[in-house]
């Protein structure tokens, strides 16, 4: 399997990286199949050979996470949602759903309480009318 990954070079504590296509079993700094670009994390300088990268991606090469981020910034591939982001968003969605259920439950309880209160008021009004009428008829 061909991977698109970074090959380190430069001085100690002043690392720069070359974006290379290489076999997934080869060493990090081993001989690459093709050099595709350059990345300096200190200055954020990035140079990409877009045609060669598109060709390698078309052949089925898999970019590493860091290279994927560089390619997304360069506009060569679409931004993808990674599993860690999905988990966080899933937790947030579950929390929102739970809050919505709780709010719906509270609204249903409030509605039921209002209906019960209205029914009690209607019964009280009937009860006031009925005993008065019964007492008058029993007295008269």
UniProtKB/Swiss-Prot annotation:
Gene Ontology cellular component terms for the protein in this record: cytoplasm; small ribosomal subunit
An annotated Gene Ontology molecular function: structural constituent of ribosome
Gene3D superfamilies: 3.30.1320.10
Residue stretches of biased makeup (Basic and acidic residues): 94-114
Residue intervals passing through the bilayer: none
Ranges of compositional bias, category Low complexity: 115-124
Skewed-composition ranges (Acidic residues): 130-140
Keyword Ribosomal protein annotated: yes
Keyword Ribonucleoprotein included in the entry's annotation: yes
Cystine pairings recorded for this chain: none
GO biological process: translation
InterPro entries cross-referenced by the UniProt entry: Ribosomal_bS16, Ribosomal_bS16_CS, Ribosomal_bS16_dom_sf
Keyword annotations from UniProtKB, A to Z: Ribonucleoprotein, Ribosomal protein
Region (Disordered), start-end ranges: 86-140
Family to which the UniProt record says this protein belongs: Belongs to the bacterial ribosomal protein bS16 family.
NCBIfam families (UniProt xref): S16
Name the UniProt record assigns to this protein: Small ribosomal subunit protein bS16
Source organism per UniProt: Parasynechococcus marenigrum (strain WH8102)
Taxonomic classification: Bacteria, Bacillati, Cyanobacteriota, Cyanophyceae, Synechococcales
Gene: rpsP
């Amino acid at each position: 399997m061909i991977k698109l990954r970074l090959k380190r070079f430069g001085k100690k504590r002043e690392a720069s990286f070359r974006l290379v296509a290489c076999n997934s079993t080869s060493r990090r700094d081993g001989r690459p199949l093709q050099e595709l670009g350059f990345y300096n994390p200190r200055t954020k300088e990035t140079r990409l050979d877009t045609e060669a990268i598109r060709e390698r991606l078309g052949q089925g090469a898999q970019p590493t996470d860091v290279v994927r981020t560089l390619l997304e910034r360069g506009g060569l591939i679409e931004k993808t949602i990674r599993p860690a982001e999905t988990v966080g968003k899933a937790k947030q969605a579950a929390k929102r759903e739970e809050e919505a259920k709780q709010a719906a439950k509270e609204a249903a309880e409030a509605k039921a309480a209002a209906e019960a209160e209205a029914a009690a008021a209607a019964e009280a009004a009937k009860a006031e009318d009925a005993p008065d009428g019964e007492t008058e008829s029993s007295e008269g």
